[in-house]
Amino acid sequence: MTKVLVINTKYKNFGGEDANILEEVGILSEYFEVKYLEFTNSSNLKFFDYISFFTNNNRNSNKTLKKVLDDFSPDIAYIHNTWFRAGLGIYKILNEKNIKILFKLHNFRLDCTKSYISKNHISKKNFCLKCGYISNSSFSFNKYFNDSYFKSLIAIRFSRKLLKSISKFPMTILALNNFQKEFIKSYKKD
C-alpha cells in the first residue's frame, strides 16, 4: 500500500486550512497508509526558532521529519503549510530521500508576500483583491501584517525562498483555482 506523509504547520488559531487538512487525512486514509506530521506555531519560541526566522530552515523540525521518514518510509509527502515552524529545509530533505512531493497551495500569501515594495503587491487602485491590503504609497514597504514590520519582513523572506524551493525541487503543485495554477507556473521550471 502506498504510504503518504501529510505535513502541516498548524496556525495559532484554528482555521479553514487546518480543518480541511484533517478532513483530507480521513479521506486519504481510506485509500493509503497515512501518517500526519503536524508542527505548531506557538508563542513559546525556542532558540533555534529565532534562528529559523532568518534561515527559513528549522533544525528541530528537520530532525523530527528525518525520524518520521526513517520510521514510516513514505512514498509521498503531501505538504500543506510550512510557515514558519516546519521551515523550508524539509523540501531538501524530502528531495534527498527521493520522496515524491505534493504541495498544496491554499491561499494567495505567496503572491501577496513575494516582494518588499508594496507597488509589486497591489493593483493600481492601491488595494489588493487577494488579501485586502491597502497602501497609500506605491514605493512603501510591503507591510503584509498591519501590526508588524518585522513579521512582514520575515513573511516576505519566507515566501521568496519558498518560491525558489518550488523552482528548485521536483514537486507537484496542487492549486485551488486557475489563477493560482497560472501564478505558480511562472515559478515552476519543470
Where are these regions (language model features)?
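Short amphipathic alpha-helical segments and helix-helix/interface helices
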Residues: 25, 66-69, 88-95, 160-167
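An aromatic- and histidine-rich active-site surface loop
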Residues: 78-99, 103-137
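Helix-loop-beta element that forms the nucleotide-linked donor phosphate-binding surface
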Residues: 164-169, 181-190
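Membrane-proximal helix-turn-helix segments that form the acceptor-binding/catalytic region
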Residues: 63, 109, 120-172
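N-terminal subdomain of nucleotide-sugar transferases
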Residues: 1-42, 70-72, 93-100, 172
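A short, charged, and often flexible helix/loop element on the N-terminal side
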Residues: 39-66, 78-81, 142-155
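Short aromatic-enriched loop/helix-cap "lid" or pocket-rim segments at secondary-structure transitions
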Residues: 18-19, 46-50, 90-91, 113-118, ...
